[in-house]
UniProtKB/Swiss-Prot annotation:
Source taxonomy: Eukaryota, Metazoa, Ecdysozoa, Arthropoda, Chelicerata
Assembly: Heterodimer composed of a large subunit and a small subunit; disulfide-linked.
Protein name as annotated: Phospholipase A2
EC number: 3.1.1.4
Alphabetical list of PROSITE patterns matching this protein: PA2_HIS
Pfam families: Phospholip_A2_2 (PF05826)
Native source species: Hottentotta tamulus (Eastern Indian scorpion)
Family designation: Belongs to the phospholipase A2 family. Group III subfamily.
Tissue occurrence: Expressed by the venom gland.
Catalytic activity, as annotated: a 1,2-diacyl-sn-glycero-3-phosphocholine + H2O = a 1-acyl-sn-glycero-3-phosphocholine + a fatty acid + H(+)
Amino acid sequence: MHTPKHAIRRMSKGEMEFFEGRCQRMGEAKRTMWGTKWCGSGNEAINYTDLGYFSNLDSCCRTHDHCDSIPAGETKYGLTNEGKYTMMNCKCESAFEKCLRDVRGILEGKAAAAVRKTYFDLYGNGCFNVKCPSGARSARSEECTNGMATYTGETGYGAWAINKLNG
């Protein structure tokens, strides 16, 4: 197959860098839901206070992104995450679901419902609960210094299938 000469044009280094950057940003944008900077895989935010058009929904996702978790392949609280996705603390999952349900507005409410349905019903990776033995809390922060976690199991068909097929 031949490319017609009229379709080929030399670009300056600056033009090329502009288009490369644009393509890279588009790739990132496809990982988050439209109108948000935090809802999806990764985030597009410049800093912690940077929220998208759907700021209430985005705030839910941002809080969830900064919650207690165990990344795929890592161990924390004596529990190894053998799945393909990050495993979240069940308290974080409950707070995230409540936050999504509390989002109001015609468009933003529908967007929050879509995130909730996708994340909990389809993705549904399950979560972990941490039990802290008595006397194992830090006096300063009330944080559990020697907790043990248990996994709840997948709740969504998508996570179950991916973890089983790739496991």
